[in-house]
Amino acid sequence: MTQDITQQDVLDAPFMKEMMNTTYDMWKLGWDELNGGNISYLLKEEEVRSYFDLNQVKRTISLDFPVIELANQYFLVTGSGKFFRKIIENPEECLAVLRVTSDGESVELLWGLSDGGRPTSELASHFMSHIVRLKHDPNHRVIMHTHATNLIAMTFTHELDEVQFTRTLWQMCTECLVVFPEGVGILPWMVPGTSEIGKATAEKMNEYRLAIWSHHGIFGAGESIDQVFGLIETVEKAAKVYNLVNAHPDGAKQVITDQQLIDLAEAFHVNPPNKYFS
C-alpha cells in the first residue's frame, strides 16, 4: 500500500523549505539574475521516503556522464532555466527530486519539473563535485553555484593566482581565514554547462570547498545549505571590501599582516597551509 502524500506535505519538508528560502535570499542579494545559479542537495533516503513514494518514477533522464559513485543516491536540485525568484512561488515546476540509477547512467525524477523541464545544466559539475567532496567529508551534502557580484568583479581586477587571491580575501575581513582556512581555488574562464568545467571544478574540490569561476561566479561545497551559503557570503563580503578599498585613490594604507593571520589561526585552532605564508 502506498502512502497518500499531498503536495502540501512535500512543501513542508525541512529540506524543501531550506531550498525555497535560500534561493529567494540569493536572488534578493542580486547573485542570481534571470536563471543564473544552481543548487544540489544530497538527501538521505529516510528523508525522501517520508514525503515521496519511491516506487513512482515520473520519468528517467539520461546523463552524458556516468556517476556510479552516486548510485541510488537522492538529490533535490534546481531546474535548468528556472528563475530563483520564482522557486518560492512555484517549487514543483522549478525544483526536482532525483534518484541516481543503480548503474549511474541516468537519474529518475520522483517529483518536480512539472512543466517537462530538465535538471540544472550544471549537473555534471555538481555530481562530479559531490563525488570528490564525499571522499573528503562523509557529512558533505550541498553544492551551490551562484553569481556573487563583487567576487566576479574582483576576478577582473586581481591577479588570478590562488595563493595571492586567498591572501587578499583573508586580509579584507578578519573572519575569512577562520571560515575558509584552506583558501579558495580558481578556474580560468571556461564554457559553462560542460563536462570539462565539471572535471576542473571537481579537481579543485579535492583541496578547497570554494572554487571561483573567473568572470562568472563561484562553486561552494559543505554539509548544509546554511554552511555553504555562509561560505559564499563571507567571500563575497571580502570581495566587496576589496573593491571598495581599491576604488579609493590611495588604495589600502594598511592590511591584516601575516603575523596577525598566524595569530588568528592559532586562536581559532585552524591550520591554513604553509604556502600562504612562504
UniProtKB/Swiss-Prot annotation:
InterPro entries, alphabetized: Aldolase_class_II_sugar_metab, Aldolase_II/adducin_N, Aldolase_II/adducin_N_sf, Rhamnulose-1-P_Aldolase
EC number: 4.1.2.19
Gene3D superfamilies named among the record's database cross-references: Class II aldolase/adducin N-terminal domain
Cellular localization per UniProt: Cytoplasm
Active-site positions on this chain: 122
Domain of life: Bacteria
Pathway: Carbohydrate degradation; L-rhamnose degradation; glycerone phosphate from L-rhamnose: step 3/3
UniProtKB keywords: Cytoplasm, Lyase, Metal-binding, Rhamnose metabolism, Zinc
Named cofactor requirement(s): Zn(2+)
GO cellular component: cytosol
Binding-site list for Zn(2+): 145, 147, 216
Enzyme class: lyase
Pfam families recorded: Aldolase_II
Free-text comment on the cofactor: Binds 1 zinc ion per subunit.
GO molecular function, one term: metal ion binding
GO biological process: pentose catabolic process; rhamnose catabolic process
Coiled coil: none
Catalytic activity: L-rhamnulose 1-phosphate = (S)-lactaldehyde + dihydroxyacetone phosphate
Listed PANTHER family: 3-OXO-TETRONATE 4-PHOSPHATE DECARBOXYLASE-RELATED (PTHR22789:SF0), FUCULOSE PHOSPHATE ALDOLASE (PTHR22789)
Sequence similarity: Belongs to the aldolase class II family. RhaD subfamily.
Task performed by this protein: Catalyzes the reversible cleavage of L-rhamnulose-1-phosphate to dihydroxyacetone phosphate (DHAP) and L-lactaldehyde.
Protein name: Rhamnulose-1-phosphate aldolase
Organism: Oceanobacillus iheyensis (strain DSM 14371 / CIP 107618 / JCM 11309 / KCTC 3954 / HTE831)
Name of encoding gene: rhaD
